[in-house]
Design a protein with these regions (language model features):
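N-terminal targeting/leader regions
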Residues: 1-20, 26, 33
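C-terminal helix-cap and adjacent tail motif
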Residues: 5-7, 11-15, 167-200
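Short beta->alpha linker loops
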Residues: 22, 55, 150-151
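Small-aliphatic-rich amphipathic alpha-helix that forms the alpha element of a beta-alpha
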Residues: 34-36, 78, 100-101, 106-158, ...
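Glycine-rich phosphate/pyrophosphate-binding beta-alpha loops
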Residues: 38-42
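Short secondary-structure junction motifs
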Residues: 43-46, 142, 167
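Glycine/small-residue-rich phosphate/adenosyl-binding loop
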Residues: 49-124
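A glycine-rich helix N-cap at a beta->alpha junction
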Residues: 68-71, 77-80, 161-181
Length: 200
């Protein structure tokens, strides 16, 4: 299937079929795909927690507002985290890069604009991996839902990944055949191509 057709088919699934589980092999493939996600100057300021343990998943579901039901119905929840400590990030992630990338890009164009800018830039890299991940799920025939509607403070406490702050989560599974949000029931709503694409 072409990428355009996949883009038309994928959607933020609201109701999953709890009888259809994704396999261990698919989970391992998704882990490898995320590890290969691109990032600015290959900075990789992230961690991805794959939650399959039913007890932990249920605790997280209870901290996920309107997303609770969806999390309870799938066997995989992936939590995307960003590194918290800028100094540690520079030492661990940037010191191994070609020096010119750090002195020619990171220092003058990111760091020079202040700590808030560095943090926002680091988070942007994690969001980029989300787009990559959602496309990979579609390619693998899996349904997925990105979720910012989660209690970040409680997620951090439950997952206890030292030095990493959760940003959002993604459920992965198979949609219920009657899901009201399926594009067959709820056509995709987007601005017109001419409103979002400029051709010069
Ligand atoms: C970063 C991000 C956070 C989102 N958070 C939620 C969420 O918490 N719950 C939910 O049901 N959908 C969530 N969505 C799904 C969007 O509402 C959905 O992608 C958008 O309405 C477009 O619909 P489509 O993905 O089905 O084409 C989120 C999407 C993104 C990209």
């Amino acid at each position: 299937m072409s990428f355009l057709d996949l883009a038309k088919r994928r959607y933020a699934t609201k109701n999953y079929d709890p009888t259809k589980k994704i396999s261990v092999e698919q989970i391992e493939e998704l882990k490898q795909i995320l590890t290969l996600s691109p990032s600015s100057i290959n900075s990789q300021p992230w961690k991805f927690t794959f939650v399959t343990d039913p007890e932990t998943k249920s605790k997280l579901a209870a901290q996920s507002y309107m997303n609770e039901n969806s999390i309870n119905k799938v066997n995989l929840l992936v939590v995307f985290h960003v590194m918290e400590d800028i100094e540690h990030f520079e030492k661990r992630n940037l010191s191994i890069l070609p020096e010119a990338w750090v002195s020619g890009f990171y220092e003058p164009l990111v760091k020079a604009n202040g700590r808030a800018n560095v943090k926002a830039w680091m988070q942007s890299q994690v969001y980029l991996s989300l787009g990559y991940f959602l496309s990979a799920c579609a390619h693998m025939g899996l349904d997925a839902t990105p979720m910012e509607g989660i209690n970040l403070k409680m997620y951090k406490e439950i997952l206890s990944q030292d030095g990493y702050a959760p940003l959002f989560a993604v459920t992965v599974g198979y949609a219920d055949a009657d899901d009201w949000a399926h594009p067959g029931n709820l056509p995709k709503s987007r601005f017109a191509l001419d409103d979002v694409i400029a051709s010069i």
